[in-house]
Amino acid sequence: MTPTSFNTDAGLLTNEQLLPKVIVGGDVLSFNVGIMERANMEKQLSILGFAGSLRKGSYNKAVLRAAAELVPNEASLEIFDLEGIPPFNQDFEKTPPDIVKRFKSKIRATDAILIATPEHNYSVPGVLKNAIDWASRPYGDNSFEGKPVAIMSASTGMLGGARAQYHLRQMFVFLDMHPVNHPEVMVNFAAQKIDEQGKVIDEETRKRIRQLLESLVAWTKKLKQ
């Protein structure tokens, strides 16, 4: 039987060479599967996260950093800082500033979105609403369209930012985004669960963040089918 060749990142290999192992990103992985199964190996899902706060000691930035530590192995999380995005001006929606162009490009390139939001005046903070307005405009050029999304929130109060989350969900209807519904991550009394260095120290909170990420990954895979 003539050996079959298979083109990989490591070069042109025969099926005999591929049978015991395949090189992926510098790591050698062993498989007891056929060549076609190797060819269909799932790529790592990408998640873009951002927090609706500019504050240096933000609790929501802290839960986002915790998410980066807890993301499942089959996914990666990149955090985008909203610092520097100017107030939305519809006069410039077709020629936005460079930071907005980068933000929209990151959104389009990612598989899923993770938002961490404070609650201001029973609703979404201006920083987050402003970023969403830029990224979804002009009409017909909505970077968020079709994206799976998960929400986290943290506050020093009892409700943990619940009202901001529900207002965000209203926006998702128009933005044509697909939110994860469970579990809900609403970190109440955040000062007791996040230390002075900005690390989430409450194990139950870390567990729920991990579960939310697992749900987001599963939901993203399902939507891709």
Regions found by a protein language model. Give the residues of each.
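N-terminal beta1-alpha1 ligand-phosphate binding loop
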Residues: 42-74
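Short, Lys/Arg-enriched N-terminal segments with co-localized hydrophobic residues
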Residues: 28-40
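Helix-loop-strand module that forms the ligand-binding subsite of alpha/beta enzymes
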Residues: 95-176
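Short hydrophobic segments within beta-strands
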Residues: 50-51, 80, 152
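N-terminal beta-loop-helix "entrance" segment that forms/cooperates
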Residues: 82-98
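Glycine-rich phosphate/pyrophosphate-binding loop and the adjoining helix
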Residues: 41-48, 178-225
